[in-house]
Amino acid sequence: MNKWTKIFACAALCSGILAGCSSNDDAIKVAPLPLITASVEVVKDWEHSVGNGSDDFFTKLMPAIAYGKVFASDRDGIVAAFDQETGNKLWQVALGEEGSFFSTQSAQLSGGIATGYDKVVVGAESGMLFVLNQADGSVVWQKQVDGELLSKPLLAMNKVVSVLGNGKVIAFDLETGEQSWIYQQDVPALTLRGTSGIIENQGAAFFGMPSGKIAGVLLEDGRAIWEAIVTPAAGGNELTSIIDVDSTPIILGGTMYAVGYNGNLAAIEVRSGKVLWKRDYSAFQSLTINGFNLYLTTADGHVFAIDRRSGLEVWSQMGLENRGLTAPAIFGDSVAVVDFEGYLHLLAQDTGEFVGQIEIDDDGHIAAPLSVDGRLYLQSKDGLLTALSIK
């Protein structure tokens, strides 16, 4: 219990632990590490340390893959590029070093890295947005905004779009750094520590809101298209009134899927914003999808497969309760999640049964694994970047 409390003190509210602690500490029961018979063998292809990682902050530092490279950062300002195949370091820059904008202070990088248009983009809790050249890491431009940048930006239509911690969504010209538009949303008095990622579809940007809604705006000028309620406002105490949609929506076949905290998993028609179905699940981690199944990890560490056509539950795995799971990722024929002790767990996609397990880094993980070209890439809290494959 002491180890759990230490590791997740900053994230207690996000993981739903605070609600249990507020009334009865004994109600928090962390599942023991499952003892399994593995049928899938996972091997480490390469690993590298990227600075100091998140420095024990609740910062979802997540790598990005493009141009045959893996890009990763630490909270202090290190951004590095590695060869995707071999893991060899290609370049590294320090955005928080003496002589930079931040002098000797940490750059406070946060959220994920975005790539596109030969650029690498990363934001900071301080409100600084950095745009780098993907070839060598040189700074193309940087811009101060009036809010925290806590999630991965979107690069689309030659713009970089970010959701700020104060509820604003802001777009800049990717080449010049000039502001293109700004969209303002109301923010409740009490919200989770985080913001939704953004996705693009047919010239529009879609993102979750602290008010329990999904919003769509035109990328060209930021005009609102529609808002859809994932989780309606609720009464009760302050904790139950937190209804953020901090997960990044996903779109497939004209339907968007999103999940909220203290709320619902919803399927939404992209064209109109009409809610097609809702189911009662509480999550702040993003979803993943494969075939007809949606996969999600709930705030209390349960893993579910949901039929995306009907919203009906296909299977559930309760054996990782309160182990601080990341969002899921598809890895071969398995669903991969990582827990607070740094163990990667593989679940069969069709049944949810445990099929593999390996310890990656005992410092633990917050950001979701990244599955690309048959490999799984993970970045731990202490900055260890690991590439895995199935033997």
Tell me the role of every PLM-derived stretch.
Residues 1-21:
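Sec-dependent bacterial lipoprotein signal peptides
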Residues 15-37:
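Bacterial Sec signal peptide processing site at the extreme N-terminus
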Residues 28, 36-64, 92-114, 140-156, ...:
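Extracytoplasmic beta-rich repeat domains
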Residues 74, 117, 124, 164-165, ...:
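Structural signature of WD-repeat beta-propellers
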Residues 84-86, 133-136, 173-177, 219-222, ...:
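Short loop/turn segments that connect beta-strands within beta-propeller blades
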Residues 295-305, 312-346:
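Loop/turn-rich, solvent-exposed surfaces of beta-rich toroidal or solenoidal domains
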